[in-house]
Amino acid sequence: MGKKVLVVDDEKLIVKGIRFSLEQDDMEVDCAYDGEEGLRMAKEKAYDIILLDLMLPKMDGLEVCQQVREFSDVPIVMLTAKGDDMDKIMGLEYGADDYITKPF
């Protein structure tokens, strides 16, 4: 297997599409469907990149990003429907490395 990717998004159809696409490129993909689960998985396993939704149940993506930054410098890409410049700035200030708006 190739790179290890953690996808954290509560929209199961989007997760399925991302997982399929990444696995076609020989990447190992783990998925979490809420912020708490995503944070737990990020603590338990070393990933090469985290794809993180902004609006998540239990803990939002900004909080997850901020907490991951306390123990890891893994690249984090925010994937979200919120495309305002202010949302992008907030994501980057909380530690994200890049920001992609849905749909992509």
Annotated model-derived regions:
Residues 1-104:
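N-terminal/domain-start alpha-helical segments
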